[in-house]
Amino acid sequence: HITTANMACGFHAGDPMTMVKTVRLAKQHGVAVGAHPGLADLLGFGRRTMALSPEEVYADTLYQTGALSAVLKAHDMELHHVKPHGALYSMLSASEALGEAFARAVIEICPEPMIYYPAPVENHAVTRIAADMGIDVVPELYFDLSYDDVGGLILKRANEGADLADTKLRLARFLESGEVLSVNDKPVAMTARSICLHGDGPNAVDLARTICDGLAAADYTLAPLVPTPTIAGKAA
């Protein structure tokens, strides 16, 4: 039910054996693999903010994505994209200096750089900088999280998992109108090229199946994204 997987690279979760096993599984099922670098915080699952300099963000991103890239190369696969995790995502959204350091590392690792970030991507410092550096920025939509009135993600998930009936309605609305409803029932316009769901959700498999069925019913074909070349922040 998925085309692409974000893989933790050892800092907030994961380890060498898990990375190798997961890459093999992804290859077996034809799933593209992207790096999911985070902060060096296993106990906090990378969700606690840390004070890092731009050079530390650059080095940490290079280290994690480089490790996964090597595992992929050993299995005749390529790194598909990079997507920051947890508190690192929030830090890059707020800081242009950290965002530039992250983007610089991505360019040096990826032959055709793509970063995945929550829509609307113009809300984030790192995505604005990355686009200007020629990185393909992929806006993502979420159905296991809620949105505020300006399209920001509310980073809290229901313990019981996503409401599947509500997911069907939200997906249908987005496909028809290009809008999602905020927690206050305000319509928010969105542009997205990918739909993200969290694999640790209690009903993640059912959620993936629900989304896939909805997309298939609307005649969408699911496949890993192909990078869109950019020049000075614009599609080539």
What are these regions (language model features)?
Residues 7-12, 91-92, 110-121:
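Catalytic beta/alpha-barrel core
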Residues 95-103:
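Charged helix-capping and loop-helix junction motifs
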Residues 22-34, 73-76, 107:
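Acidic (Asp/Glu)-rich catalytic clusters
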Residues 36, 82, 197:
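Conserved, mostly hydrophobic/aromatic
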Residues 42-84, 91:
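Glycine/small-residue-rich loop that forms an oxyanion/phosphate-binding "nest" at active or ligand-binding sites
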Residues 5-12, 43-58, 92-93, 151-163, ...:
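Glycine-rich tight-turn/loop motif centered on a GG-T
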Residues 113, 206-236:
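C-terminal domain-boundary segment and adjacent tail
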Residues 121-182:
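Active-site rim beta-loop-alpha module in soluble metabolic enzymes
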